Amino acid sequence: MTDPLNPTRLQNHPALARIIESGRTNLPTGITTSGALSAYAQNAAAIIRDNREREKVEIADLNNRLARYVEKVRFLEAQNRVLENDIGVFRNAAHTHSERIAVYFESEKASLFTLVRENKAKISTAEQNIRKLEPDVISAKKNLESSFQLRVQTREDKRSQMKILSNLEAENSYIKRLTTDCEEEKSRVHSEISRLRSDIKRVHALRDKERSKHSSSSQELLKRLNGCISQHDIAIREEISKARRDTTNKNRDYFHNELHAAMKEIRDRFEKDSRAARKTWEDWYHKKITEIKKGSESYSSIQNQAREEILRIRSIVNEFRGKLSDSETINQQLIKRIDDLHFQDKENLRLFEIALNEKENLVIKMREECTKLSVELDKLVENQINLRNEINHYRKLMENAEHLRTTVQTHVTYNAPPPPLPQSGPRTTSYHAYGSAYNDSLL
């Protein structure tokens, strides 16, 4: 907003400059001492400005509405003048064209009747063509229904074959699972056999170890016995040498008896110990032999059972392989049969679609011809209705003209100038050529 105390503005308003120079205290209520407007004054000025703008917009809108109204009034006045001229022309030409109009409408009526008869003949021929095509359409529908039934039958056959195929696949998967189970059982039996072989090897190793241990202990015992024998021989020789030194017979007998008794006692103890050791060793060997025999018998029984199980599994696997090969051959035959049926179904469907499209094209052509005939018939009916309306309108005009003529003859003699004739001759065409808008304007 501009400053009211601007020097350029004060130069243009000398009275305001004198008031400001006379005293700053005598300012109006809307202006402050610094020369600017107060907030209240600014608000009032803005409201006044908005009101002025709104009034300007309303005045412009009213001006536009008034201009449109004036244009409409002028247009309606021009139309009224045109209609008055047309009414004058019709009044002047009524007494000259009354007979010609009747003849013209009679000829047009006859031509319309001929057109209606031709259209009826066309409609009858179209109906005959439709009746001729009805058996083809019925046969096409029957073929369609039969093809649908064949399609349903083929689908049912396909589903049954798919069911058989799924059963064969299920049996195949079951056989494969049994084969894997047999392979697992075979691997388990092989692992059990390997474990038993390792146990046998371990038992043989323990047996060899114990045998070597006992043989070493027996060798050591023999060495100890030989040492004891050598010591005893040495002691005996010493005693014999001592006895030889003793020359008395009594001592000799005593030593001989003691020596024989000691030797007998040693021999008895040795035989007793050897018998006990032999008995213990024989018992231990018999025990170990029985244990080994029992282990070998259990191992042989397990091995025989495993061998029988392997033979049984092999027979089952061979049987399953034969069934699997048979099912695979049947599966291949069914797949080939399904492919052949698919191809045959597609071919039949393609041929049927071609025939159906041809029939549909024929039906569409007949429908188009029927629609064209119906449109032409509607046009003819509309033309007939318009002609009847025009005849009624001209009849009313003629009646009005006759009424005006009688009234003029009874009251006032009216000398009307003859109507201007066209250069190319009298007008005999129908107002129907101008369309329905001209008829509405006449009405």
UniProtKB/Swiss-Prot annotation:
Which residues does the annotated region (Tail) include?
404-443
Q: Where is this region: Linker 12?
A: 240-257
Q: What does this protein do?
A: Cytoplasmic intermediate filaments provide mechanical strength to cells. Not essential protein.
- Native source species: Caenorhabditis elegans
Offer one example of a GO biological process linked to this entry: nuclear envelope organization
Q: What are the protein's GO molecular function terms?
A: structural constituent of cytoskeleton
Region feature Linker 1, mapped onto this chain: 91-104
Q: What's the protein here called? A: Intermediate filament protein ifd-2
The record's section on PANTHER family has: INTERMEDIATE FILAMENT PROTEIN IFD-2, LAMIN DM0-RELATED
What SUPFAM superfamilies does this protein's entry cite? Answer: Intermediate filament protein, coiled coil region
Which gene codes for it?
ifd-2
Q: Where is this region: Head?
A: 1-58
Q: Give the family this protein belongs to, as stated in its UniProt record.
A: Belongs to the intermediate filament family.
Region (Coil 1A) residue ranges read: 59-90
Predominant location category: cytoplasm
GO cellular component terms, alphabetically, are: cytoplasm; intermediate filament; nuclear envelope; nuclear lamina
One Pfam family cited in the UniProt record for this chain: Filament
Q: Where is this region: Coil 1B?
A: 105-239
The UniProt record lists the IF rod domain at 55-405
Q: Where is this region: Coil 2?
A: 258-403
